[in-house]
Amino acid sequence: MKKALIIIGIALGVILVALVAAGFYIVNANLAMEHRGQDIEGSYKEMKGDYPEMIPWLDSLQKTGGLKESTLLRDGDTKVHYYYAFAPQHTGKTAVICHGYTDNAIRMFMIARIYNQVLGYNIIVPDMPHAGNSEPNHISMGYYESQIARKLAASAQNIFGDDTTKVEIVVHGISMGAATTMMTVGDDNVNKDLNIKCAVEDCGYTSCWDEFSQEITNSYGIPPFPLLYVADLVCDIKNGWCFHDASPLEAVKNTSLPIFFIHGDKDDFVPTKMVHTLYEAKTKGDKELWVAKSSEHAFSYHDNKDEYIQKTKQFVEKYME
């Protein structure tokens, strides 16, 4: 009997060690890995190929020194790099534009062009931690990224405002950037303090937990329990946040800020059903929903450029004074 208990104990210990090791692997492989968003030159090349309409705008900004760069510190440690540009005509209207998972600021320049060239807004486009020219750290699926977006919104008054011009903000993000956007605007008091007027979220998920749950099943063919639970604990210990902390769903429940929800109906990375859950969960304030036909994940603009611009412009201009 005693020998059997020892064997069982050893087996359980081996299983526990294996689970913890697998949990560390999941966290590091998904949140602290090398990725395309760290390739600046490759990002420029790919974006110019996919979105040639942005080339004249970008070339003009770069030649005239209009595309400026700066940094801020996230909680005094990680240096966050961002681009910014003034509107063609002086204004306080400003867009904070948030990139997606394994992307960087450059990979959001097609959206930045809409706000700067078409709508005539100032723009701020950050490289979130572990992307672009920002310092390596880890991806937090919108948790720390939303805090950074708020800091940038707060900085906008110093960058673009003056004694007679009060800056007003729209936040726009795609994929993880959409999750970041929703969490950025999830507190009405903060929105009021920062003068955030509206938000556009494009193919954001309901929560990091929900997204990882379906990905672990799709990628590894296993249920979330127990591996995702162990990975969640590892992330909390290692990075200071849990997967449930990154919850756009809770954010939209709490905010009355106007939000435009966009999603492709062929999205299987962030399932289209998530946008309906988010839209229905927002019971306070204005909201609009557009499901782009035949578009896969993060391709709603790519596939429907004119309609995307028209719908975004129509929504945003209702709230930006």
Regions found by a protein language model. Name each.
Residues 139-160:
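Alpha/beta-hydrolase active-site loop
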Residues 112-135:
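Conserved alpha/beta-hydrolase
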Residues 254-256, 261-263, 267:
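Short beta-strand/loop motif that positions the catalytic acidic residue
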Residues 183-241:
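Hydrolase active-site cap/lid region
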Residues 295-306:
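Catalytic histidine-centered segment of alpha/beta-hydrolase-like enzymes
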Residues 111, 248, 257, 271-280:
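Short alpha-helix in the alpha/beta-hydrolase fold that links the catalytic acid
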Residues 4, 8, 15-73:
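An N-terminal hydrophobic leader/cap segment in hydrolases
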Residues 101-114:
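The serine-hydrolase catalytic nucleophile loop
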